[in-house]
From Swiss-Prot:
One of its GO terms (cellular component) is extracellular region. It is found in: Secreted. This is Snaclec bothroinsularin subunit alpha. PANTHER family: MANNOSE, PHOSPHOLIPASE, LECTIN RECEPTOR RELATED. It comes from Bothrops insularis (Golden lancehead). PROSITE patterns: C_TYPE_LECTIN_1 (PS00615), C_TYPE_LECTIN_2 (PS50041). The keyword Secreted applies. Its main location: secreted.
Length: 132
């Protein structure tokens, strides 16, 4: 069972945090909230829809982005994208690549797309963890 202020979906618990942090601080914060916690990763359309609904309910109208756990990592000359929880990107909803290395959900009317933006930006975020 998830803690009372977290929302269950599948085998994980999710929580939207309103406070704004950069990507690295948000990832660290998630890992401190729960054992095995990370910024949210998505493994299916259903999981993405669930999180988008959670964010849509809670996010302030002035906020345009919410961090997710996807970051482009440079390994020697190869560029790979991995979720912050270590899972590989088997499921993508991404358009284009630039020097902006960290991904967030972007509010486009009611639909959230994944967009890569500068990692130092301060944004709210979603944590995902296994149940305690």
């Amino acid at each position: 069972d998830c803690p009372s202020d977290w929302s269950p979906y599948g085998q994980y618990c999710y929580k939207f945090f309103q406070q704004k942090m950069n990507w690295a601080d948000a990832e660290r914060f998630c890992s401190e909230q729960a054992k095995g916690g990370h910024l949210v990763s998505f493994q299916s359309d259903g999981e993405t829809d669930f999180v988008v609904n959670l964010v849509t309910e809670k996010i302030q109208s002035s906020d345009l982005y919410a961090w997710i756990g996807l970051r482009v990592q440079n390994k020697e000359k190869q560029c790979s994208s991995k979720w912050s929880d270590g899972s590989s990107v088997s499921y993508e909803n991404v358009v284009g690549r630039t020097v902006k290395k960290c991904f967030a959900l972007e509010k486009e009317q009611e639909f959230f797309v994944w967009i890569n933006i500068y990692c130092g930006q301060q944004n709210p975020f979603v944590c995902k963890s296994p149940p305690p």
